[in-house]
Amino acid sequence: MLTTMKKSSLVLALFAIAATALVTITYALTKDQIAYQQQQQLLSVLNQVVPKEQHDNELYKACILVKNNDALGSKQAMPIYLASLNGKHSGAAIEAIAPDGYSGNIKIIVGVDSDAIVTGVRVLSHQETPGLGDKIDIRITRWVDAFLGKTVESSEDKNWAVQKDGGQFDQFTGATITPRAVVKAVKRAVWFYKTHQEELLTLPLNCETK
């Protein structure tokens, strides 16, 4: 009986070692491809929120990490990608969190030109209700296009609210919390850029190259 148990333990140990080795080998073989795919996804999103005609630098490499919980919605440092055209600063793509979504955090990226006018907004991740709150996703509706061409005039700019709250942005039938959260997050990100642009341009590039 004892011999049988030892054999079983040995078989299990060998199986665990083999499984670990397989996972390690698989990771080693695929990590470069995964990193490449992530880089391509990032490039695609950056070019959607900061149009190609607005920059000629490698935007994903011109990245700084900024920590500002009030403006960017996270205690963690968030990436800001600095655009330039013909050697001059021409805008940015700012990642931020809307912490007050209906189902939790909504991660967004906001593109602006050097005058803090919005050039694009995309939702990077969310857990909002399908058929209701998920209309913030560009793959579902073009709702985020309502931000295009707009800027924030002050931290108290009342236009930056959903219509139910007296602002200019549509809410969704049966889902006001989600668009309200996104509008507030975009507003904070744009205002942060508008009031800190000179400071941001003095910071060293400190993101890991993706």
Swiss-Prot record:
Biological processes, Gene Ontology terms: electron transport chain
GO cellular component entries: plasma membrane
Keyword field contains Transport: yes
Transmembrane segments: 9-29
The protein's Enzyme Commission number: 7.-.-.-
Subcellular locations according to the entry: Cell inner membrane
Principal location: membrane
Enzyme class: translocase
Membrane-related topology note: Single-pass membrane protein
The entry's keywords: Cell inner membrane, Cell membrane, Electron transport, Flavoprotein, FMN, Membrane, Phosphoprotein, Translocase, Transmembrane, Transmembrane helix, Transport
The protein's role, per its UniProt record: Part of a membrane-bound complex that couples electron transfer with translocation of ions across the membrane.
Alphabetical list of PANTHER family matching this protein: ION-TRANSLOCATING OXIDOREDUCTASE COMPLEX SUBUNIT G
Family that this chain belongs to: Belongs to the RnfG family.
UniProt name for this protein: Ion-translocating oxidoreductase complex subunit G
Organism: Aliivibrio fischeri (strain MJ11) (Vibrio fischeri)
